[in-house]
Amino acid sequence: MKTIVALGLLALATAASGQFLQDCTNALDGLYAIGNCESQFLTCSGGIARIMDCPADLIYNEPLLICDWRHNVVGCEGSGEASGEQSGEGSGEASGEGSGEASGEGSGEASGEGSGSGEGSGEENNVCEGLEDGAYSSGGCTTYYFFCTDNTARFLSCPTPLFYDVATQKCAWKALVEECNGEIIIDGSGETSGEGSGEASGENSGENSGEGSGEFEPTCDGKADGIYPNGVCVPNFLTCSGGIARVMNCPASLIFNPDILVCDWPRDVAECHGLSTPAPVCEDDGYFSFGQCSSSFTACTNGRAIVMFCPAGLKFSQANQRCDYDDLVNECQEASGEESSGEASGEQSGEGSGEASGEASGEASGENECVSLDNGLHAIGCSPRVLSCQNGHVDIFECPSSLVFNEQTLICDYPQTSLKCLIEDTLLIDETPITPFDCSTNGLFSDGLCSATYHQCSAGQLINFTCAETNAVFSAANAECVDSSTLLQCH
């Protein structure tokens, strides 16, 4: 026990000092950053180190242990975008992702360009000076907020696509945040014609029809930082950060909903009503890959098709009917380049697979869990995890990030639609308890939404812990015990 605690403190001290792990020597099983604003991260499992890639346009957010949008990671808001902007339209986005991000880390952060206005410059005043302990907005319509504890500030950001609501002191949909009223702009006259075929050339441009051939380029002129529609009933949206426009793609089968500013099911998007959408073909039950070396696949059960995603860094094997590492997937071996094909298929999952731990495919450790269940998909509590039972064979798959599996509709949907989710209007899925048999994913997990007890899963073994300090509870997002006053769910 003392050894595990000591290793945990060593890992936290290493991260706090700015020294990043390059291997798993003396490191606990888990996820680790390998640098600032990096699109890759390190996974440690049984002492074995693996470098995993985030989906396209995302970087690793170490406090939340997920791949996240750059503007959601404190200190990375302006990095990597300036050089991409200078390289020109069309190929500019693609080159910005390669050399742009690298140069952003080398020079962008150091010079403080973009919105990095003096972070870490030593000139900032203490924002908690004279404030009582509690949560505060960073100002206006923003995803950023901070906690003041004993005159010390801790800066956080809401998970995409939520914004901080001062009135309720929690993250909420943008449409419900008073400070954001009047900032939701839907321009039906210009944004619908030939949007962004040139802009999207570096990111999944296959989803765009290409009409306009780049003559119209989305712009953030006159718009505050945030998310905006990019057309009517389209599978992409516009993000504005520091005046720079980017077209982002929704996960497979989802359409951007301008009313709540999230990627949503077409049935819930008012603009799509009356428009024909192709129904997925699902003649036989089973699991079917989206293509060569892909992290996305379709689960067919009782004639219904459900789009699923492998955990981060894994690909779906049609032959083995499971998610696995690239070198164990035949489709990836046949591809010409494992690295490039991995990133290409990773784009399909969008923000959907960022929070997964990257451990191998998640076959359940309890083979008897499907004995009393029918063949099909079953929810594992209020979580993105899905239990698959097929003739006694057990697998665990995942819904996209921020979604949970709804057993009534048999789709991945928002938490408030699931009977197993008791907390409404929250995406703090990492804090929900997991079922006792499911210890296939290595890491630290809370025993409840506001609990002083937590447990560690390592190689299928479960170890229980209790926070030592009075009023301390375990935060799954921070992977450590924190004061209960700093967690919104404890208020």
UniProtKB/Swiss-Prot annotation:
Short name of one Pfam family: CBM_14
GO cellular-component term (any): extracellular region
Q: Which residues are glycosylated?
A: 197, 201, 464
Gene Ontology annotations of biological process type: embryo development ending in birth or egg hatching; mitotic cytokinesis
Which N-terminal stretch is annotated as signal sequence? 1-18
Region Disordered: list its residue ranges. 80-126, 187-217, 336-367
Q: Where is the composition biased (Gly residues)?
A: 87-120
Q: Which GO terms describe its molecular function?
A: chitin binding
| Residues in coiled coil | none
Q: Which cysteines are joined by disulfide bonds?
A: 54-67, 158-171, 250-263, 310-323, 399-412, 467-481
- The UniProt record lists the Chitin-binding type-2 domain at 21-78, 125-182, 217-274, 279-334, 367-423, 436-491
Q: Does the keyword Repeat apply?
A: yes
Low complexity bias: start-end ranges: 200-210, 356-367
UniProt keyword terms in alphabetical order: Cell cycle, Cell division, Chitin-binding, Developmental protein, Disulfide bond, Glycoprotein, Proteoglycan, Repeat, Signal
Q: Quote the function comment for this protein.
A: Required for polar body extrusion during cytokinesis in embryo development. Affects cortical granule size. Shown to have roles in meiotic chromosome segregation, osmotic barrier function and polarization in conjunction with cpg-2. Binds chitin.
Protein name in the entry: Chondroitin proteoglycan 2
- Organism for this UniProt entry: Caenorhabditis briggsae
Specify the taxonomic lineage: Eukaryota, Metazoa, Ecdysozoa, Nematoda, Chromadorea
